[in-house]
Curated annotation (Swiss-Prot):
It catalyses: L-glutamyl-tRNA(Gln) + L-glutamine + ATP + H2O = L-glutaminyl-tRNA(Gln) + L-glutamate + ADP + phosphate + H(+); L-aspartyl-tRNA(Asn) + L-glutamine + ATP + H2O = L-asparaginyl-tRNA(Asn) + L-glutamate + ADP + phosphate + 2 H(+). Coiled coil: none annotated. It comes from Deinococcus deserti (strain DSM 17065 / CIP 109153 / LMG 22923 / VCD115). The keyword Protein biosynthesis applies. This is Aspartyl/glutamyl-tRNA(Asn/Gln) amidotransferase subunit C. Transmembrane segments: none annotated. Heterotrimer of A, B and C subunits. It is an enzyme of class 6 (ligase). GO terms for biological process: glutaminyl-tRNAGln biosynthesis via transamidation; regulation of translational fidelity; translation.
């Protein structure tokens, strides 16, 4: 069970400023979540092999094979704007 001191600590770590009505709801939600974990803790896992991942995924990568290289003139013709031999694109990150 989450008590007021633990909620204050979690709120501080998460940089949350909780109103009194939010504190009650947050406490109830966290206790509900912890209740689910308690149910999981009670599951008998004897004989179940530990896994690093729930699904065995393997990356299947192909060999890098050099392909067709476009001539600089073709790239320049396709680019919206060129500057100093490089493609100019719109700014995506604003400077502070």
């Amino acid at each position: 069970m989450i008590d007021a001191a633990q909620l204050d600590h979690l709120a501080q770590l998460a940089r949350l400023h909780l109103k009194p009505e939010e504190r009650e709801a947050m406490t109830a939600d966290l206790n509900s979540i912890l209740g689910y974990f308690e149910q999981l803790r009670e599951v008998n896992t004897d004989g179940v092999e530990e896994m690093q991942r729930p699904v065995n995924l393997v990356n299947v990568l192909r060999d890098d094979v050099p392909g067709e290289v476009f001539a600089p003139e073709v790239v320049e013709a396709l680019a919206p704007e060129m500057h100093g031999g490089q493609i100019r694109v719109p700014r995506t990150v604003e400077a502070d």
